[in-house]
């Protein structure tokens, strides 16, 4: 699968302009979403097209490092100070013991939605539990791999421009199934200094043990170093802004001895659509990602010449107009793009190069293309599978690799909360069968102590056999 790179022109492809809302007082203006034909791009141009906007972390690190150092030295006091500075909230208590908190009252429809989501997410992640397998590689040589839960984990649930209780479920449920003993959930407090009731409901349902009422880099630092009230964790999960991401990056390479789930960037979607896809659905799927924030990445891959682009344009303008977060969506679309593919092979080839966080395939007989997909965080197949179902309640996890990292990282799963150990056990016969080969390899590498650890035992086995004769 490859593009026809014989033509290099970028200028002959049509430009698809979407009517989207901007932050100006003029209301709605025409906002262009750049478009390209894949068959007219060179390899280097395709490489440039799939590259995400560069994030300059140098200045962000300059801001975040002092926060991390302050939390390390001052603990809860620093967390309170930064929460007052950034969130305008004075905290009396930084961490709550979830067992001491009552389950909050929720509207019955909201509670039912969370309960259905919980059941589906639990079922999908519970099914990921693997049985222990033992292999006898040669007579008397048995090897196996066993799993153990990570003892303490930190879960970051953003507050920011939107409350995300769904993220509490996505992170806490696999931790609950894995059997993590200490589960700290960090989330910014409300203006009253309390915990968002929807987040608290999900946290209690999914077995969270502590809630850290803080967000940003200070929350990540508190979980990494530990404070008087916040347990130190061994691995930190969850999405966040650039400051949260920077804190995770810094701390995983520090004396804190903490690991993280994956690198993170702005949220993104790539939609592959042909003439059978509804313009209404295409527009809705693009906007559902664009509304996350102005830095969201939105890509539309049009297959063939039968797609009604004008209808998509009209639907985007219509739907964006009624969105409370329409300004975010507008800004995201302004730096996103459309590509035109001659067929599905070309479309999927580009998608695999782009490696999107979310991939929607809305074409005729969409299921038959699943086998060609190599790089994507999560895939949504067919006209009745909007990205929203995976974001909330289908059962798959919505904490996924972004920024092209789907080429080498997986989304959060049950395995993310486990560590694996290998175990081997040899009988006398096993060492007699395997030992000479090990001794030879150790000798080649010049590691005499390794060799001796085997040969001393082999001599004892030989002596024992001689005595019994």
Swiss-Prot record:
Pfam family, one: Histidinol_dh
CDD domains hit by this protein: Histidinol_dh
GO aspect biological process, one term: L-histidine biosynthetic process
Entry's Gene Ontology cellular component terms: chloroplast stroma; cytosol
Pathway: Amino-acid biosynthesis; L-histidine biosynthesis; L-histidine from 5-phospho-alpha-D-ribose 1-diphosphate: step 9/9
Residues at which substrate binds: 267, 289, 292, 358, 391, 445, 450
E.C. designation(s): 1.1.1.23
Protein's recorded name: Histidinol dehydrogenase, chloroplastic
Naturally occurring in which organism (per UniProt): Brassica oleracea var. capitata (Cabbage)
């Amino acid at each position: 699968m490859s593009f026809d790179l014989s033509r290099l022109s970028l200028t002959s492809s049509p430009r698809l302009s979407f009517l989207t809302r901007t932050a100006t007082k003029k209301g709605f203006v025409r906002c262009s979403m750049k478009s390209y034909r894949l068959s007219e791009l060179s390899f280097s141009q395709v490489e440039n097209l799939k590259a995400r906007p560069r994030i300059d972390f140098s200045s962000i690190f300059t801001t975040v490092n002092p926060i991390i150092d302050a939390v390390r030295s001052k603990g809860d006091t620093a967390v309170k100070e930064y929460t007052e500075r950034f969130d305008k909230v004075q905290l009396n208590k930084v961490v709550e013991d979830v067992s001491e908190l009552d389950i909050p009252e929720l509207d019955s429809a909201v509670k039912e939605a969370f309960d259905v989501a919980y059941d589906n997410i639990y079922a999908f992640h519970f099914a990921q539990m693997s049985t222990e397998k033992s292999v006898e590689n040669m007579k008397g040589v048995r090897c196996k791999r066993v799993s153990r839960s990570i003892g303490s984990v930190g879960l970051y649930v953003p507050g920011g421009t939107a409350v995300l209780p769904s993220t509490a479920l996505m992170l806490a449920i696999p931790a609950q199934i894995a059997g993590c003993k200490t589960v700290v959930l960090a989330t910014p407090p409300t203006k009253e200094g309390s915990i968002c009731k929807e987040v608290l409901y999900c946290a209690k349902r999914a077995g969270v043990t502590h809630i850290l009422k803080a967000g940003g880099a200070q929350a990540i630092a508190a979980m990494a170093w530990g404070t008087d009230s916040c347990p130190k964790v061994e691995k930190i999960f969850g999405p966040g802004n650039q400051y949260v991401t920077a804190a995770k990056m810094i701390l995983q390479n520090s004396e804190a001895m903490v690991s993280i789930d994956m690198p993170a960037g702005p949220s993104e979607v790539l939609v592959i659509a042909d003439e059978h896809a509804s313009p209404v659905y295409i527009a809705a799927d693009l906007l559902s990602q664009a509304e996350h924030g102005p830095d969201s990445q939105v890509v539309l891959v049009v297959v063939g010449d039968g797609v009604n682009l004008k209808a998509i344009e009209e639907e985007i303008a219509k739907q964006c107009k009624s969105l409370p977060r329409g300004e975010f969506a507008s800004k995201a679309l302004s730096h996103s793009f459309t590509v035109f593919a001659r067929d599905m092979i070309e479309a999927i080839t580009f998608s695999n190069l782009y490696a999107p966080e979310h991939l929607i395939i809305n074409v005729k007989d969409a299921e038959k293309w699943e086998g060609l997909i190599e790089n994507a965080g999560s895939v949504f197949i067919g006209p009745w599978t909007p990205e929203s179902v995976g974001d909330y309640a289908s059962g798959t996890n919505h904490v996924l690799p972004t920024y092209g990292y789907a080429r080498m990282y997986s989304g959060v799963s049950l395995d993310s909360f486990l560590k694996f150990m290998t175990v081997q056990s040899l009988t006398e016969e096993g060492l007699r069968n395997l030992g000479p080969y090990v001794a030879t390899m150790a000798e080649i590498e010049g590691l005499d102590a390794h060799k001796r650890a085997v040969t001393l035992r082999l001599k004892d086995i030989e002596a024992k056999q001689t005595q019994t004769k």
